[in-house]
């Protein structure tokens, strides 16, 4: 999928579903809440076609959902392949999940902010976190997130499974429902930036930054419904979870897990408002600058947000900017600046490495100098300062820049004297 035009969406989701009406509003509304901008949905012969569902119709009419019909058994991989090929060019990131899976950011409330740190990779693979029945025989009223709060122990074998959020531009093809083949030279990583084997569907369990809450069982009634419905991923007479699996899993140790509950107040408020078309198009949208073609417009508005400590808005503006300007070192340098302002040294260094790989602009070294000074890394700061003083790319007639160097010299000298006296 090389050579695509600029994407429209920073984060979209692809899913295939059948007869999921009781869960649609919660699932789609939740994912809008955490930053998903568009849904590519494949209706696999639902008894009531999805385009007859009023909520789905509202999403379609608001421009938030693209609906396809797909007939036959084991159509998950064909649907994924169709989505990657036909809709991938419209997306920076595309997640492939099911209706019983909820993407769950743990460090931030908006998944796009996390994904911005992984833009140099083809795929971010997130581990499953599998939940049980919480003792329900019949399907309870209310939300899935509220009803099911007990998961299997962290070391459970199910949790080695991952689900993939891919960059279509860097992705060659579908491997399984869990994993994709990256393009030549590209890498899939887990949340700690550790590369995964080519096309891997399993990874060491890690739930530090994000995970996929998989509501595997729900109630016994739901298990029976899934057994009757059959599978969408493979041609098999055995369901994902059969009665024997259900009884075995019921007997396994479970632990309380409330990590996703922080989203409930906003989710319930939004559901109570009825998901009006106006809300779907306007709420959680990127702040739109007047000229989307100019990186400087984005960085200026992002800087204004950062001055007011509205860091989420500031970072989301740069996510929007990356749809057009991912090859500009200035974008990555500004991202590093935002991370440093929040005390997030790791992301700042990663952003600066990316910036330097694109173009060794002076601003990048200035930001690196500020980062080292702020962190008290005197020797590293002195090395960057020495480079700046002798680099031919630096304008020595820039009064503002020279003042900054003088301040940096003094700060480094103070830090050095402080260490010696200690």
Predicted features, each with a name:
Residues 47-96:
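Active-site-proximal specificity loops/subdomain of glycosyltransferases
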Residues 292, 326, 359-360, 393-396:
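Short coil turns that delineate tetratricopeptide repeat
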Residues 307, 341, 374-375, 411-414:
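Register position in tetratricopeptide repeats
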